């Protein structure tokens, strides 16, 4: 990427990091932005991922789709629920991943953290129509209490 930006904000209740890059500009004529917010009161992480087309190509991108992938560590198991994905973390901890916009599916992937022994893992994939979402996907990861 030629252009990258990062900004950080901190308050007593929230920490925010916003990042953007144009790595896909040459091939797809888009820039990407991710806003991560950690709510220190509600103990959750929220994300907003956005695709920005070059102005003159906005109408061409309308029929495209965007996809986000979240690869889970091998020690984390997951179950799809009606409103998201329940993540079970070692130590009897549970987190709930939810999203707004698009369709979520679970797929197989490969973890190469231990280079000698690749492991099969699960990844969560959210795919959304740019036209329906205006190029945005919102997601949230929060503690789940039974």
List PLM regions with ranges.
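CBM-like, beta-strand-rich accessory domains located in the C-terminal region of large
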Residues: 1-146
């Amino acid at each position: 990427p030629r252009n990258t930006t990062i900004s950080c904000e901190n308050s007593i209740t929230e920490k925010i990091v916003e990042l953007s890059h144009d790595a896909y500009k040459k091939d797809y004529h888009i820039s990407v932005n991710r806003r991560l917010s950690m709510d220190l009161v509600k103990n959750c992480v929220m994300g907003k991922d956005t695709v920005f087309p070059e102005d003159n190509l906005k109408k061409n991108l309308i029929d495209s789709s965007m996809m986000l992938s979240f690869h889970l560590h091998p020690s984390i198991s997951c179950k799809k629920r009606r409103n998201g994905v329940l993540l079970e973390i070692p130590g009897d901890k549970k987190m709930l991943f939810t999203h707004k916009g698009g369709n979520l599916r679970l797929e197989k992937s490969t973890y190469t953290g231990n280079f000698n022994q690749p492991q099969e893992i699960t990844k969560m994939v959210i795919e959304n129509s740019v036209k329906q979402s205006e190029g945005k996907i919102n997601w949230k990861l929060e503690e789940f209490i039974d």
